[in-house]
């Protein structure tokens, strides 16, 4: 009942598979945002229909939840107001994640701001403009500096994250979506990040609370 908005970035399973479990206890109405589709991936409206429609995977939702859906055109790179209530503003923009339609988000609440990179390779300078001067940038530390091929097309290297944070003049970087189980590998990647960004870096963990001001 406390969830006002579910902002979906893209439709890889690790970013969308838990949606039925999140919505199951609440019922009634759900406000969601998500990407446009393409030949390989559904739009947010198509995704919801395939999951919750009368002929979907969970047809029990068809009469249980009413969806209020906003679609962000990820191909245009235009900034879209996703939710604007009082002093709470959520905006989305398309970001480059290989061939996957993907949204990065920015949340401004009063004077505080947080940006969520989502999965992306960091090749579009419009995202740096989008995150300018945020208090916290949440990044996905998924590949190392030696990434190549399709992996590098999907995900930004640690040096790229650092350069983006520096150019965006962000107040703090919060590292999430950590793919390696090795503490040594993680420290190496964090070292490259810090070589390219001089601000504070926090490594995310379950139940972490971070003050934003």
What are these language model-derived features?
Residues 113, 121-208:
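Cap/insert and terminal regions of metallo-dependent hydrolase folds
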Residues 1-114, 191-194, 200-212:
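Binuclear metal-dependent hydrolase catalytic cores
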Residues 117:
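Short hydrophobic beta-strand that contains or immediately precedes a catalytic carboxylate
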């Amino acid at each position: 009942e406390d969830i006002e908005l579910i902002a979906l970035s893209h439709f890889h399973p690790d970013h969308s598979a838990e949606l039925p479990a999140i919505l199951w206890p609440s019922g009634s109405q759900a406000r969601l945002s998500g990407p446009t589709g393409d030949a390989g991936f559904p739009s947010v409206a198509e995704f919801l229909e395939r999951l919750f429609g009368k002929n979907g995977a969970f047809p029990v939702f068809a009469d249980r939840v009413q969806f209020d859906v906003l679609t962000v055109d990820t191909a245009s790179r235009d900034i879209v107001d996703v939710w604007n209530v009082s002093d709470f503003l959520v905006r989305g923009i398309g970001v480059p994640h290989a061939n996957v339609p993907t949204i990065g988000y920015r949340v401004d609440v009063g004077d505080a701001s947080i940006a969520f990179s989502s999965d992306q390779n960091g090749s579009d300078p419009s995202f740096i403009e989008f995150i300018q001067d945020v208090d916290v940038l949440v990044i996905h530390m998924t590949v190392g500096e030696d990434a190549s091929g399709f992996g590098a097309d999907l995900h930004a290297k640690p040096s790229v994250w650092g350069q983006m944070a520096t150019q965006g003049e962000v107040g703090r970087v919060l590292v999430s979506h950590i793919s390696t189980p090795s503490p040594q590998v993680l420290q190496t990647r964090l070292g490259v990040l810090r070589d390219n960004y001089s601000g504070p870096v926090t490594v995310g963990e379950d139940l972490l609370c971070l003050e934003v001001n």
